[in-house]
Swiss-Prot record, chains A, B:
One of its GO terms (biological process) is alanine biosynthetic process. The modification N6-(pyridoxal phosphate)lysine is found at K412. It comes from Saccharomyces cerevisiae (strain ATCC 204508 / S288c) (Baker's yeast). Pfam families: Aminotran_1_2. This is Alanine aminotransferase, mitochondrial. PANTHER family: ALANINE AMINOTRANSFERASE, ALANINE TRANSAMINASE.
């Protein structure tokens, strides 16, 4: 027990060799709101020349709190006062009473990583992990000294961020959004706007009708579920896409990108370590990160690389059964289709098999379908909702209880509007009660950004034939699509032509996930540098060519195999040639 | 134990009176991707006329999953098959093995509210609660039949959503955002754009410079911490606002509104029931909702109504000590200044006293300062950051460890851009390590909406004297400000002139939180209707006048007292007169 009163001296432990000088205390008196001489419960006794000099230095030290404290301690020892560090812990959450008088106190310690929610510490998100962070450092270095590296720019192939790589936004979208932001333009004479050649008539009309749906301003909160008129557009889009299988606006939630939808769904179903969520390996690490935050279990099911990263339903069922045996409830099953990072697109049969397992075990399915507009020739996308409805028709009673949440986003496709945060989820088989719970969660974040909601409307209702923007819009889409295909195929063929790297043929999405078969010497050097072999390859690739990718470990892979994920969004084919040269040199250097 | 094989019949319990007919199973074979005749592991045996007729009815029933199942069961009993309901639970998480052959299975039950994360079920957010939901119903009713109610429109005084109530956005902001959305406009000849009288020159220039900061497109993901150039603007704004106390861009995080910042901060520090977060009562219910989601404890500290809802530091310290005694760690202290719902603005002394407690106990302070631009004449806003720096200067060593997160938003002030989701937090006293943890959390959501980030830049760097938009921008701001003041004062004076309702004088924010002293008869009727008295008053108010408010219980209040929160955003003064009439009639009806 310690007691302190004004002017007492005491020794707490041997490590404190200085005597603590007490502070004079003045009671707080009310005062005018004049700054900066406020009276507070205490004042310092020191006003030495050293302190005055020190105060000038302080702003620089304030940058890092720990430096600041070190500097303060230094100052205190300069002035003969003892370090308070050793005492601080006493005041933190004292189990004993520090009897204070006149409001003197010892400042408690800061909160540190030790105080942070462990779930947050555990969560990892590699897409913006170590290699991309290194790329940022190199980018900054190039800005200072453009000649200092063997390349002149960083190519961010680590993230599906098309417009960062000079992909142009679709003109129609941006005309509409521009008009929504500045409705004064809509008060102008339509013909004058059209004659200015800045806005097309159909864009003007769409902006006006959207403005009505929205209620008059993109600056007002909308309903938390999203603007009703836009949800109707989404439902119509889904119905048409799914060959007439009806979708209802009540089942649609507009969200700030698909990531927000994942967040809601996992918040709702994750109850802690006894909850299991099946995720494909390799996966998009949003899922494992969110599971870590929710302190729930990831149940990985491996995709089969050799058959184009296909999904194996027996694998899924095995994982489910094992979870049950381990008393973990396999509550949710995540399917990413088209796959990220794999680029695989599921056949109707695969989807049906997945639903069998879901129906049998009562597992909610999350269908992450954000890449459904990124499909390569020769492949057809079938939505999981459509297949579910077919199964329900064909096999009455078997699939009626299946609960499915299907996600889409304006970040991908050919629009690539990642920074606008538009998306939606469609809930199938969720009761009104369950939807109300999700609505409540959504209401705590108030509403998704309204311009993002508008963008969803544009995505699901693009210009149609006969409308003024149709032809140019089609031309823009085709151009982007063709370039993506060309780059994807070039990269794919390049990988397969080189030794030590092979790749499954992409069917969709924006990524390749090649397997790297590193020579033993390279693996040794990686270990020496305390990197995994895939990190090592990615690091070398970055430092030689400026191409930033993400090691396969960020997505999960069969133990003993090494991959990396790259996008094929960067314009041109030059960077692919650079990669090819680098790879050959790398293997020349490390070949056994 | 049950075993099933093809064509077996069995009875499970007395309640199953029908015999289960087995299904023929066909092994899945690969097939062309032709729809809809996919082969699946099993097929139904039924294809009766009744079923075909039923299928036409099905789309309507699909709307509600439970109706769908009922319909299916009905169909099955029509065709002589027994209900599968009673068997479903067996397959859910079977502890025994259901030996199946040929992939037949019984569908498991759906997940229901019983399976939902309890924390989500517990969370409440009253701002969009029962009374506002009733208002939405009445709104829909008015759309169908405008004469059916004693009022012609709903006035949403329940939410701080200015642009929903015809407050116009600031022209300068919207010109810049419009240009950012459609950069083609920036490629035009500047003079021509100006001559069109649609865009002012300073808006064009700002859009160009922001576009450079952003990196070329609002459609690309930005860095997760937010565009660097915009963070610099924020740091400069804070430094200037705080009389030269330096703010650093590294300490700034741009966020999707202040709500996202609260979400990050509480995720990081909430570790479960042993974590306590002090919140003011009354509070903005985002805090209690988020605490419920994080399964941590709210530690309420009561604001003092009779002294204008001031903060009592002794009350705060008492709450802290009690928490410690109950083995709850008082980790975070939330201060809402200006207050929501109270409208109170803290004096420098009050702030200093709050920091004393924080410094003494090592509690992180969240300063929710989103209403700092909504200050009434005669009141001055002092940021908590500024006061902290003063305390650190005046009392070296005492306050060095204090950790503070200060929040701001583009949703309030005179811009009222709620739907655009712009905001920031400034971290003071957080080490680099701690900032990295927050950065990681932010990266899981990728980035805040980029146009919202741009709006933050506009908020902290409005047009200045000499620039083309300055005068009109000032005029717009003053006009909005004056109208807000007029309505606030009118409402305040009206409340205080009536019996049974009294109100503290607002110093800032967008709300009044009057206390209602209901007559006993009214309290009785409320209880009869199973409503709290404040809900009852709000419901009556809504149904008589269309004015939608939020009962005080949504924000917290001293037990035995009743309040409601209303905004003063609705245009004009007519609705205030309506309220006055309603209140007099209400008291005439219920007076003892």
């Amino acid at each position: 027990m310690l007691s302190l009163s004004a002017k007492n001296h005491f020794t707490v432990s041997n490590s404190i060799t200085h005597v603590i000088k007490s502070y004079h205390i003045r009671t707080l008196t009310s005062s005018a709101e004049k700054m900066p001489h406020i009276t507070t419960p205490f004042s310092t006794s020191a006003s030495s020349t050293k302190l005055k000099a020190f105060r000038k230095v302080r702003p620089v030290l304030q940058r890092h709190s720990s430096s600041w404290i070190v500097a303060q301690n230094h100052r205190r020892s300069l002035s003969g006062q003892s370090s308070l560090n050793d005492l601080r812990h006493l005041n933190r959450f004292p189990h004993h009473t520090l009897k204070t008088s006149n409001n003197e106190f010892y400042p408690a310690e800061q909160l540190t990583l030790e105080d942070v929610n462990e779930n947050v510490l555990k969560a990892k998100y590699a897409v913006r992990g170590a290699i991309p962070m290194r790329a940022e450092e190199l980018k900054a270095q190039l800005e200072k000294d453009p000649q200092s590296l063997p390349f002149d720019r960083i190519i961010n192939a680590n993230i599906g961020n098309p417009q960062q790589l000079q992909q142009k936004p679709l003109t129609y979208y941006r005309q509409v959004l521009s008009l929504l932001q500045y409705p004064e333009l809509l008060n102008q004479n339509e013909q004058q706007l059209v004659d200015s050649k800045l806005f097309k008539l159909d864009a003007i009309k769409r902006a006006k009708s959207l403005m009505e749906d929205i209620g008059g301003s993109v600056g007002a909160y909308s309903s938390s579920q999203g603007v009703e008129g836009i949800r109707k557009s989404v439902a119509e889009f889904i119905t048409k896409r799914d060959e007439g299988e009806i979708s209802y606006p009540e089942d649609i939630f507009l969200t700030a990108g698909a990531s927000a939808a994942v967040n809601y769904l996992l918040s709702i179903f994750c109850r802690g370590p006894e909850t299991g969520v099946l995720i494909p390996i390799p996966q998009y690490p949003l899922y494992t990160a969110t599971l870590a935050l929710n302190n729930s279990q990831a149940l990985p099911y491996y995709l089969d690389e050799n058959s184009g990263w296909s999904t194996n339903p027996e694998e899924i069922e095995t994982v489910v059964k094992e979870a049950i045996q381990n008393e973990i409830k396999p509550t949710v099953l995540v399917v990413i289709n088209p796959g990220n990072p794999t680029g695989a697109v599921l056949s109707p049969e695969s989807i049906a098999q997945i639903f069998e397992v879901a129906a049998k075990y009562g597992t909610v399915v999350i269908a992450d379908e954000v890449y459904q507009e990124n499909i390569f020739p020769g492949t057809k996308f079938h939505s999981m909702k459509k297949i579910l409805r077919h199964l329900q028709r064909e096999h009455p009673g078997k699939f009626d209880n299946v609960q499915l949440a299907s996600l889409h986003s304006t970040s991908k496709g050919v629009s690539g509007e990642c920074g606008q945060r538009g998306g939606y989820m469609e809930l199938t088989g969720f009761s009104h009660e369950m939807r109300q719970v999700i609505l409540k969660l959504a209401s705590i974040s108030l509403c998704p950004v309204v311009t993002g909601q508008a963008l969803v409307d544009l995505m699901v209702r693009p210009p149609v034939e006969g409308e003024e923007s149709f032809e140019s819009d089609q031309a823009e889409r085709n151009s982007i699509h063709e370039k993506l295909i060309t780059r994807a195929m070039t990269l794919y063929e390049t990988f397969n032509s080189l030794e030590g790297i092979e790749c499954q043929k992409p069917q969709g999405a924006m990524y390749l996930f090649p397997k790297i078969d590193l020579p033993f010497k390279a693996v040794q050097e990686a270990r020496h540098l305390e990197l995994t072999p895939d990190e090592f390859y990615c690091k070398k690739l970055l430092e030689s060519t400026g191409i930033c990718t993400v090691p396969g470990s960020g997505f999960g892979q069969e133990p003993g195999t090494y991959h990396l994920r790259t996008t094929f969004l960067a314009p041109g084919l030059e960077w692919i040639k650079k990669w090819e040269s680098f790879h050959k040199e790398f293997f020349d250097q490390y070949r056994d």
